[in-house]
Amino acid sequence: MNAPPAFESFLLFEGEKKITINKDTKVPNACLFTINKEDHTLGNIIKSQLLKDPQVLFAGYKVPHPLEHKIIIRVQTTPDYSPQEAFTNAITDLISELSLLEERFRVAIKDKQEGIE
């Protein structure tokens, strides 16, 4: 079978970077972010967060091949705002939102457990 071993989908190899950034020469003020060992789950949530930013003109992602465990996110921004800054802000906002979700989830579980006991 041609499928790679399962561990290759989540373990970084020695010297392999999690994220690489390349300038997109086809359009102005754009970058390609390649994120290794990730899939549609992370790609879609980052793309959605990027599109909430009014200074982001375009955000999209693709998985080059089903057997390659990486995503490529393309971001184009207004001239006075860098794609790297947009990407960093999107990640920071996502971390905040997910932390709040976790906190609310824990409180709901605690409330439910106290109601049962």
UniProtKB/Swiss-Prot annotation:
Residues recorded as bearing N-acetylmethionine in the entry: M1
Classification via Gene3D superfamilies: RNA polymerase, RBP11-like subunit (3.30.1360.10)
Presence of the UniProt keyword Chaperone in the record: no
Single Gene Ontology BP annotation: transcription by RNA polymerase II
GO cellular component terms, semicolon-separated: nucleus; RNA polymerase II, core complex
Record keywords, A-Z: Acetylation, DNA-directed RNA polymerase, Nucleus, Transcription
GO molecular function, one term: DNA binding
Keyword Magnesium: no
Pfam family, any one: RNA_pol_L_2
Protein localization: Nucleus
CDD domains given in the database record: RNAP_II_RPB11
UniProt-listed PANTHER family: DNA-DIRECTED RNA POLYMERASE I,II,III, DNA-DIRECTED RNA POLYMERASE II SUBUNIT RPB11
Homology family: Belongs to the archaeal Rpo11/eukaryotic RPB11/RPC19 RNA polymerase subunit family.
Function per UniProt: DNA-dependent RNA polymerase catalyzes the transcription of DNA into RNA using the four ribonucleoside triphosphates as substrates. Component of RNA polymerase II which synthesizes mRNA precursors and many functional non-coding RNAs. Pol II is the central component of the basal RNA polymerase II transcription machinery. It is composed of mobile elements that move relative to each other. POLR2J/RPB11 is part of the core element with the central large cleft.
Subunit organization: Component of the RNA polymerase II (Pol II) core complex consisting of 12 subunits: a ten-subunit catalytic core composed of POLR2A/RPB1, POLR2B/RPB2, POLR2C/RPB3, POLR2I/RPB9, POLR2J/RPB11, POLR2E/RPABC1, POLR2F/RPABC2, POLR2H/RPABC3, POLR2K/RPABC4 and POLR2L/RPABC5 and a mobile stalk composed of two subunits POLR2D/RPB4 and POLR2G/RPB7, protruding from the core and functioning primarily in transcription initiation. Part of Pol II(G) complex, in which Pol II core associates with an additional subunit POLR2M; unlike conventional Pol II, Pol II(G) functions as a transcriptional repressor.
Name the record gives this protein: DNA-directed RNA polymerase II subunit RPB11
Source organism of the structure: Bos taurus
Upper taxonomic lineage: Eukaryota, Metazoa, Chordata, Craniata, Vertebrata
